Amino acid sequence: MKKLYFFVLISITLTHINAQTFSVSPSALIPDNTTTNYTMAVSGLPTQMNLANVGIEAAQINITHTKDVDLTITLISPGGKQIKLAQNNGGSGADFTNTFFYDTIPVNINEGIAPFNGSYAPYEALSSFNNLANPNGIWTLRIRDQTVTNTGTLNSWGIKFSNKPAGKVSFSSSNLPILIVNTGSLTIVGGTKITAMMSIIDQGFGIPNYITDIPNIYYGNIGIEIRGQSSTSFAQKQYGLETRDALGNNVNVSILGMPPENDWILYAPYNDKSLMRNVLAYNLARNMGRWASRCVFCELVINGIYQGVYVFQEKIKVDANRVNVTKLLPADTLGVNVTGGYIINIDKDPASWYSVVPPNNSTAGQKIRFTCNSPDTVDIMKKQRAYIKSYVDSFETALNGVNFMDPLIGYRKYASVTSFVDYFIVNELSKNVDGYRLSTYLHKDRITSGGQLKIGPVWDYNLAFNNANYCNGNLTTGWAYRFNPVCSGDTWQVPFWWDKLVTDSCFKNKLYCKYTQMRNSYLDTVNFFKEIDDNAALVNAAKDRHYKRYSILGTYVWPNPAPYAKTYAEENRNMKNWIKARLAWLDANILPYGVCNWITTGDNIDKNFSLLNVSAYPNPFTKAFVVSMKINKTSSYNIELYNINGQVIRQIKTDMLIPDEYNFYIDDVISIPTGIYLLRISAQDGSSKTIKLVKS
């Protein structure tokens, strides 16, 4: 039962424009096992709470109650924003006696001992209120008593507004790049980009940047919007932006050492208190030879207000320097042209189509949804959508079939095994609770460039590396891909793929090889922990400003697992301890179950050349055969089939291929005579391989 008490304003303390306190003294009952609202009117303030002029600085409560742990105390703004001041704190102790809440107090209410008197940091940061909302109107103090037998009294409560609002930070210089955004009178919203001006200052490593410096990296127009899904409720917002010219057209520019483009992300690591979980995952993928978003730590100012530490990074996009697949044009609807390139994703977005195979272990009829990302759902042509859907359907059907391990008709005909291996390692090391089922991207190039489905780029790892308190996301044991049996009722399930892949000897052997390679290099704990330490050193000064702006250390922010680190150093120490234990579990569960044969042919191919390994199968062939290539360098390739007279009877000229494994399917040879043939594969650097084939 919820009760409502409305009280007339008892007192107002006014000190010109510096501070204004509103308080009431209701002496009202706090009923047993009930949620009760107590309200207070606020008026006469400016119409926006912000960090520049006026905002909420503190809250105060005076409660008599025999058992504080029974209470959850929430402050609610006129616009409906809710902040928990206290939640089940104090154990069996009693009373909040003239208890004040300031974000700047080093001792959080979680750490206090009842009776609570004096000043504490609230359970959640008050600075979240200072988000341009109107402070005038009805404020609510909601008190939930969760048990029976213990009642109490709300004696008084109040709110202090001032020109020193919670979260206000004095900011003049940084060792990180400084981004300054000015929107004029416009408000940044989600879904539609507004026009703004952006300046970027970066004097180089080791040289301090001052907010008064002349912008030397970028100064010009942008379009900017709030982005994200669950993160939109956080005090620190994420932004997507486009660099534009004076006419509003997109313009490609190189920013902070990244290749020229116009689509960028300002990632806000609000609920990742290490500030670096995404950066770690993306760097891991790049060290495995995959493209992943390049990242630069920076500090952001919007309309004169300090916003904290951000990560400036590339957006996933078809581009020669990002997802390097052929850009699909509207006219590309037939033949080779329709075969690529595509980016699709598995996420919460409206589905372009659903998986033909339901997820394993789900209990509520959930379906895996695929969404067209590039071309997007608006721009993609019907024949293009039909093609990529049919291709993914064929991949799933082959993987789900009894012959799924067959190299010619199984899933390997459609998918790059090595890309799935690399993706598996990133997700399993990080125990990403969203892994495989959300923010999961796949891409496919044209058949002249390999044409297989590849998983990636990796994206969205803020809930990884022990940063989720649900569905076993915080455990160092267990497989992340086995999410469905743990949380079978969750709407967003993991595709069946991974349950099948881990039973395939080809996948297991490649996993063993790559994991062993990485554990002996980048994922050696000395090396990996050095990257964590280097990132921490880089943001060392900035993190103090960040956590003054967002007073959340030592508190719960969804979905942080307990215990909540009270310092930045403790957060990173906890993360490293977790990673060490996680690697030990993976060592015990990957290393015993694979065989690594780096070169499977007897060819004398120099590892410095492009071609590392080439094979063709089946041999003899009848209707078709597969050319499998493992390449070491970016190059284009000629694949030529000769008869015994030296005549070229079939030929494929590939586009530029990056280091990876590729399969090319030669399926137009059913009509050629039986006999002996020579297959020659050659690269730009002169390396080549010739294989004898027999047509039976």
Residues covered by each model-derived region:
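Middle-to-C-terminal accessory/interaction subdomains
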Residues: 174-177, 185-189, 193-197, 228-230, ...
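Loop and turn regions of beta-sandwich accessory domains that flank beta-strands and are enriched
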Residues: 20-168
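Bacterial Sec-dependent N-terminal signal peptides
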Residues: 1-21, 602-603, 696
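Low-complexity, Pro/Thr/Ser/Gly/Ala-rich linker/spacer regions in secreted
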Residues: 20-23, 162-174, 592-610
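Residue-level detector of buried hydrophobic side-chain packing
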Residues: 73-75, 141, 159, 181, ...
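Short beta-strand/loop motifs in extracellular/secreted proteins, especially
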Residues: 69-71, 81-83, 196, 237-239, ...
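Phosphate-handling architecture centered on phosphoinositide signaling
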Residues: 157, 161-420, 528, 541, ...
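C-terminal outer-membrane/trafficking sorting elements
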Residues: 15-18, 607-617, 621-696
